[in-house]
Amino acid sequence: MTSDTASQSGSVWCTTPVTMRNWEAHLHFRVHGSASNLFGDGFAFWYVDPSNRFAGPVFGNQDQFRGLGVFFDTYSNHNGPHSHDHPYISAMVSNGSHSYDHDRDGTHSQLAGCTAKFRNRDHDTLAAISYVDNVLTVSTDIDNKGMWQRCLRVTNVRLPTHFIFGASAMTGDLSDNHDLLSIKIYEVDYP
């Protein structure tokens, strides 16, 4: 979605609204670059209102979105102590009136998150994002062992149908390659 060049953004969208109530998305991705200390910014997976797929400041998509954003943040913008290291994965649900706070790396609006060392791996990395019976779960396979490690699980998450899936990435003064190799969406049978 971006090359290892400053001030870029890119995105990919499925423009058909989703009618599934319960779903799981598998992301096959690679984030890598030449810098060893300073790099950024990251990428996002989206499940949003179809009108919310325009370029903007939140990992390449617009702010004040309506729906779900799962952020794969590689750069700590927070000046001062943090309760977590980067790279960091977090989830945010917004009704269109909340902004993602880059200065605090979204920590005040996140549902949950985890540190995940997915950058500059010798192999591709995977993430699974599932929404089943109003439970949002994000898991990763960072070590390429074929085993999911839970990053976050949040109950009582309410997402409507007829939103769209997408992904976007952004670089600022710092950069990285953000390669999205595939997104696969599955309907989950749930009684």
Question: Where are each of the predicted segments found?
Answer:
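Polar, low-complexity loop segments and adjacent catalytic/binding residues used for recognizing
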Residues: M1-P191
